[in-house]
Curated annotation (Swiss-Prot):
Keywords: Cytoplasm, Transferase. Pfam families: Rhodanese. This is Thiosulfate sulfurtransferase GlpE. One of its GO terms (cellular component) is cytoplasm. Gene3D superfamilies: Rhodanese-like domain. Residues 17-105 form the Rhodanese domain. It is an enzyme of class 2 (transferase). One of its GO terms (molecular function) is thiosulfate-cyanide sulfurtransferase activity. It comes from Vibrio atlanticus (strain LGP32) (Vibrio splendidus (strain Mel32)). Transferase that catalyzes the transfer of sulfur from thiosulfate to thiophilic acceptors such as cyanide or dithiols. May function in a CysM-independent thiosulfate assimilation pathway by catalyzing the conversion of thiosulfate to sulfite, which can then be used for L-cysteine biosynthesis. InterPro entries: GlpE_sulfurtransferase, Rhodanese-like_dom, Rhodanese-like_dom_sf, Thiosulf_sulfurTrfase. GO terms for biological process: glycerol metabolic process. The active site is at 65 (cysteine persulfide intermediate).
Length: 106
């Protein structure tokens, strides 16, 4: 895969519920602490190495940010690191929240 793909929040949730994909949230620590998707891994510069050590490169990765813009750059970065199936979640956390998908509030 040379390029990431786009996926909507419902499609992302379906992959998560099937235990097929790993969701990463790239928002800032304060926003993540206030609320984040139930299964989200907080991916930062500091957690990148541990994430790459524990995840299979063949496993689909869903990248979520605030509104689906920043996630595109992060998704492409993960593709460049060798992840085979990477998606940018369109609409980001905001769309996930509006769709009333499972959220943990801090």
């Amino acid at each position: 895969m040379d390029q990431f793909k786009h996926i909507d929040v419902k499609g992302a949730q379906a992959l998560i519920e099937q235990n097929e994909a790993r969701l990463v949230d790239i928002r800032d620590p304060q926003s993540f602490a206030v609320a984040h998707s139930e299964t989200a891994y907080h991916l930062t510069n500091d957690t990148m190495v541990s994430f790459m050590d524990e995840v299979e490169f063949e496993q689909p990765i869903l990248v979520m940010c605030y509104h689906g813009i920043s996630s595109q750059g992060a998704a492409q970065y993960l593709v460049n690191q060798g992840f085979e199936e990477v998606y940018s979640v369109d609409g980001g956390f905001e769309a996930s929240y509006r769709a009333e998908l499972p959220v943990i509030a801090g």
